[in-house]
Regions:
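Soluble accessory domains appended to multi-pass membrane transport proteins
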Residues: 1-90
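Solvent-exposed, non-transmembrane regulatory segments of membrane-associated proteins
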Residues: 49-50, 65-69, 79, 83, ...
Length: 153
């Protein structure tokens, strides 16, 4: 079910429900655009109701680091960023996963909890800016794909 005030996503568009009528639902996006959603869309499209099970949501940001990086330092920095961010919740506490030994990087995922799904894009962007800044301050490189070419004579 959808109620006024819910944050929903349908067909890739996210909005806060403002009004529900017999034929349409009106929602407003984070950039203040009005979505008019025909109610039949709920039957033919996948609907995500971000507030259906409460207001606590989980999000994540992934980042890769150079293979020469101290992985414990990466974990410490990522947790510090999450702990100090004003829009992230302290409980449940943020977590860092060492996801993979990637082709070009050691891959990590910062998982966090927030209570305003309407700000998710801004929160994730803000965290990425902070990761870039903190990694730069600590001389941690975010690698890019590289290839070694061996030439035979």
């Amino acid at each position: 079910t959808v109620h006024v005030g819910d944050i929903i996503e349908i067909d890739g568009k996210i909005g806060r429900v403002e009004n529900i009528k017999i034929r349409t639902t009106r929602a407003v996006t984070f950039d203040n655009k009005v979505l008019i959603i025909p109610n039949h869309k709920y039957l033919t499209s996948t609907l995500f109701n971000w507030t259906e099970n409460g207001t606590v949501l989980r999000g994540s940001v992934s980042v890769g680091v150079d293979y020469n990086t101290d992985v414990e330092k990466v974990k410490e920095i990522l947790l510090d960023i999450a702990d100090s961010h004003p829009h992230l919740m302290k409980n449940p506490s943020p977590n860092v996963l060492f996801k993979n030994f990637g082709d070009n990087s050691l891959d990590f995922q910062l998982i966090f909890t927030y209570n305003n799904g309407f700000r998710v894009n801004l929160i994730e962007s803000d965290i990425r800016f902070l990761i870039y800044q903190k990694f730069k301050e600590n001389n941690i490189n975010i690698p890019f794909p590289q290839r070694v070419v061996h030439l035979q004579k």
